Structures are given as C-alpha cells and as structure tokens.
Amino acid sequence: MSTLDKKEARRLLRAEKQAEKHSLARNLISRRTNFFFNILLIIFCILIVFPLWIIVISSITSETALTTYGYRLWPMEFSVNAYTYLFRDGSIMITAYKNTIIATLTGTVLSVVTVGLYSYALSRPDFRFRKFFTFFSFFTMLFGGGMVSYYNMTRSVLGLKDTVWALFLPMSFSAYWVIIMRTFYQSSVPEAIIESARIDGSGEWRTLLQIVCPLAIHGFATVGLFSAIGIWNDFRNCLLINDSAKFFNLQYTIYQTMNNLRFLKENASRMGGVNVANLPAETFRMAMAVVTVGPIIMAYPFFQKYFVKGLTVGAVKG
C-alpha cells in the first residue's frame, strides 16, 4: 500500500470516528434534562403510591377519627374494626378466598392454553381457514349478545349455575388476547426456524411446545396476567349465575357485606340495639380495597417485565 493510500485510509477512519461521536452526542441528553425527567418520574411514583398509602392508613383508622379529622398520612386513632367486621365470619371469607384463588389459577391456565393454541393457528400463513376464524374471533369485539342471552347461555345451556366454573369459564377467552398472542408469534418466531424444524422431522405439536412457546413466553405471561386480574376482580358472573353462598367469590362476598352494612346504617333508627357510630362505613371500604388489591400487587412484580413487553409488542404491531 502506498503512502498516499495509507493517509487516505487514516483520514477515512478519523472521519468515521468523528461521525460516530456526533451520533452519540445527539442521542445523549444533558444532565439538566436527565434531572428533569427523574423529577417527573418521582412525582409520578408519588401520585401512584400516595392513594394506596391513604387507603391502607384509612383502613386501620377508627371511623370516628376518620369522620372528624379526615384522611391523614398516619392514623389519628388506630383501630382494626373494619377488618374485624369484614372477617367477623371467618368461614365465609375463607370460602370466598378459596373460590377466588381456584378460579383465578384454573382460569388463567385455561386462558393461556386456549388463546395460545387459537392464536398459533391464526399466525400460520398456510392455515386454510385462517381468515374465517380470524373474523369469527374479532367479530365478538364489535358485537355482543347482551345480558339476557348471556344469562340464559351460562345458566341453562352450559349448566354453570352454582358451580366454580361460572367464576372463570365465561372469561377464559378474549379476542384482544388473541391479537396479542398472534402478534407475538408473528414477530418473535421467525418462519425460518419453523421451516427448519419441519425439515428435521419435527411435528406441529413438538414445534409448538419446544420451539414456539419458549420464544413467545412474554406473550403467555401477558395473557396470563390479564386473565388473572380479570377473574380476580370480577363479580358480575357470580352475581348473574351463582345463587349459593358456597360458590361466591371474594368480590361478590365483599359486595354483599357492603350492602348489608349500608342497610344497617340506613335503618339504624328502626333497630334500637344498633349503634351507628360503631359501624365502619368509610374505613370498611378502605379495608375492602386492601383485601382485594393486596394479592394482585404482590404478584405483579413477578410478571412486570413480561407484561410491559407484551403490551409494547401488541400495541406497536397489533
């Protein structure tokens, strides 16, 4: 290589380094901007945590102190009367928790399996009836049968009355979850991998279980979290389908307890032995929120990274 060529090569190398430095400088933000964004995130976190803190503190405050002093950052008068009233009959709450946990776990697994299989079929370009089943699924996002037909279908046709199945089976499938999983299959699983597996003699089930599922684990976690939150917070199915207290879930049990408490407060004048001041009303609502949201908050950190990625992929490419 001549001296002229060496100089030209060094000049081009320096130009590339300078261009790289300028590119990095454009992508980096200043300390002042970084500090500003950190302050915004801290304020946002406070806005999220503050209501939860108020709920917890209010639930362990006496009804009289809460009525007199209002909401405080620390209980003015410590009391667990709201939780005592909520768990006054332990067997009812234990049954409600048991039914809710069983329904949530079983329904989540069922949702992941059904949505995963259905979405995988829709993601395959060689599936003959892909358009029909895509329309069949997404049609339910636009039109619903109504409450009367829903009531008759679940109670009479499917025979779900007074069963644990009523708490999760009607919620085990969603067209929105199908969109998320289909997007994951199409974006996270290259077609070349599936073709290579077929060339090596792998069948559809082996390809799905050993190759596709590990690559789409974020999608399964997202669908599972959506399903678990929906089943845990649902009380409409229990209200419409179940009549026996043995099959009530946590949300409907607390809903009934709140109605009973409201009835006592409104009709206290007719009941000489009832002291309205000792009945928790606002504190009971706060205790209900703590009892119902607590397990979900504790479980969410384990699924957070999957959940965030699932929403991102589903939103961008769905």
Language-model features: where?
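A hydrophobic, multi-pass inner-membrane permease signature
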Residues: 2-318
